[in-house]
């Protein structure tokens, strides 16, 4: 049985987690013509914006209600209304996704009531723009929770309620926050190879994939799932959720539309992908295409090649719960040993399935103290300081990755993604073991 140890320190040393509103904003960025709006101070928005820009290396349309000291005392409804109207006039978005911050949540404002009043009084001016509220206070949860809350909020506010005529070849996919742009593109490719039509919420592969739209500046996201597609999610024959944190959105969709769902806690590793391919084959009535079978064979060969480099290695991982499970099970399949596991929150049910004895809720300072005998650190770019002090190589995963290019175009799921992860890990071990030692002059 896994023991989950709570954080007992009075201060965070080298933070591991990113905030809930940042996760919520990232989910809203997966909708075409959207603008995420932080309801809080300018500083909250600026910090999140810097992290997003450094990670994606793209312009991010993130806005703020710019709460000041007067609004904190008198209430922020006026700032919220003005921000929504300004965005409608200047950017004409299809969706404004509001993410609350600790500032307004701590004050205890009736945010849902404020927004309902604004929508009622300004209905004519807001025609053509959906406004969605996700309660994402910084003081609770992390990116994982913020992403899930934003997806749930979009389903509740936009998706048409009630059972509808099902499209037998349409599948709704709810990807977890830890899937990269390349992962989502690969998901779409494999689903379409079975003759099925995927509707992916959120779809970052259409909005943050690194293209310049028609050589012009766009004030909103320039791609992603459309608001109309979100509205018609109830026509899907099946919903597939990826990651335990996406169970809530999938349950909400089932409650509102009756669409059944299947949850995959990870799509990394041979067995998990085999189950996914089997489900697609069952839904479509078709066998796995030749190119999918070939990718599976490539993964089998990679497992044989990579296990010589990874077997017996000691791995230290710091990540949010679902990504921790994804990576830990991946390394165990390679014959490695997880000697340190650190995560952001201890409430997720997936933590009890992570193949370790102890999980520490904490920060990268905890990872560093637990990883003194590790052969590899696995976390985001802020782990570089621990890596340098310990002299242990770092495999960069998750968010943010700001000291390498192309992190969002790295595959981590399905047959190809698992294969590529094996190669990456094996190459890290090889290059580190062959690194030149210091020679005195």
UniProtKB/Swiss-Prot annotation:
GO terms for molecular function: metal ion binding; nitrogenase activity. One of its GO terms (biological process) is protein-containing complex assembly. Pfam families: Oxidored_nitro (PF00148). Pathway: Cofactor biosynthesis; Fe-Mo cofactor biosynthesis. Signal peptide: none annotated. [7Fe-Mo-9S-C-homocitryl] cluster binds at residue 44. Keywords: Metal-binding, Nitrogen fixation, Plasmid. Coiled coil: none annotated. This protein may play a role in the biosynthesis of the prosthetic group of nitrogenase (FeMo cofactor). Belongs to the NifD/NifK/NifE/NifN family. NCBIfam families: nifN. This is Nitrogenase iron-molybdenum cofactor biosynthesis protein NifN. It comes from Rhizobium meliloti (strain 1021) (Ensifer meliloti). The gene is nifN.
């Amino acid at each position: 049985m896994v023991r989950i140890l709570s954080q007992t320190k009075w201060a965070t040393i080298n933070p591991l987690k990113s905030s809930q509103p940042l996760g919520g904003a990232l989910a809203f960025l997966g909708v075409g013509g959207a603008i995420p709006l932080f309801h809080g101070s300018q500083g909250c928005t600026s910090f999140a914006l810097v992290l997003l820009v450094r990670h994606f290396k793209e312009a991010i349309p993130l806005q703020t209600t710019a709460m000041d000291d007067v609004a904190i005392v008198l209430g922020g409804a006026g700032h919220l209304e003005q921000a929504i109207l300004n965005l409608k006039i200047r950017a004409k978005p299809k969706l404004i996704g509001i993410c609350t911050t600790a500032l307004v949540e701590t004050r205890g404002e009736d945010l849902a009531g404020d927004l309902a009043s604004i929508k009622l009084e300004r209905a004519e001016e807001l025609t053509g723009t959906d406004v969605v509220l996700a309660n994402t206070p910084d003081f609770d949860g992390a990116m994982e929770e913020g992403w899930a809350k934003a997806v749930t909020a979009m389903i509740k506010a936009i998706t048409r309620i009630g059972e509808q005529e099902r499209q037998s070849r349409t599948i709704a996919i709810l990807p977890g926050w830890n899937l990269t742009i390349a992962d989502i593109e690969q998901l779409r490719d494999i689903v379409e190879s079975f003759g099925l039509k995927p509707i992916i919420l959120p779809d970052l592969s259409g909005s943050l994939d690194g293209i310049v739209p028609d050589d012009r500046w766009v004030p909103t996201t320039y791609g992603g799932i459309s608001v109309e597609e979100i509205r018609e999610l109830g026509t899907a024959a099946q919903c597939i959720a990826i990651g335990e944190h996406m169970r809530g959105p999938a349950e909400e969709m089932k409650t509102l539309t009756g669409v059944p769902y299947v949850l995959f806690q990870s799509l990394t590793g041979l067995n998990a992908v085999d189950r996914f391919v089997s489900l697609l084959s069952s839904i479509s009535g078709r066998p796995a295409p030749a190119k999918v079978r070939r990718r599976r064979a490539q993964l089998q060969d990679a497992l044989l090649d990579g296990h010589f480099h990874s077997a017996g290695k000691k791995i230290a991982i710091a990540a949010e719960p679902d990504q921790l499970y994804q990576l830990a099970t991946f390394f165990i399949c390679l014959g490695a040993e997880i000697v340190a596991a650190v995560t952001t929150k201890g409430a997720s049910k997936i933590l009890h399935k992570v193949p370790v004895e102890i999980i520490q809720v904490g920060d990268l300072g905890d990872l560093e103290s637990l990883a003194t005998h590790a052969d590899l650190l696995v976390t985001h770019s802020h782990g570089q300081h621990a890596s340098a002090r310990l002299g242990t190589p770092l495999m960069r995963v998750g968010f943010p990755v700001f000291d390498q290019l192309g992190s969002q175009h790295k595959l981590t799921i399905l047959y190809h993604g698992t294969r590529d992860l094996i190669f990456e890990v094996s190459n890290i071990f090889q290059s580190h073991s062959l690194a030149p030692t210091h020679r005195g002059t």
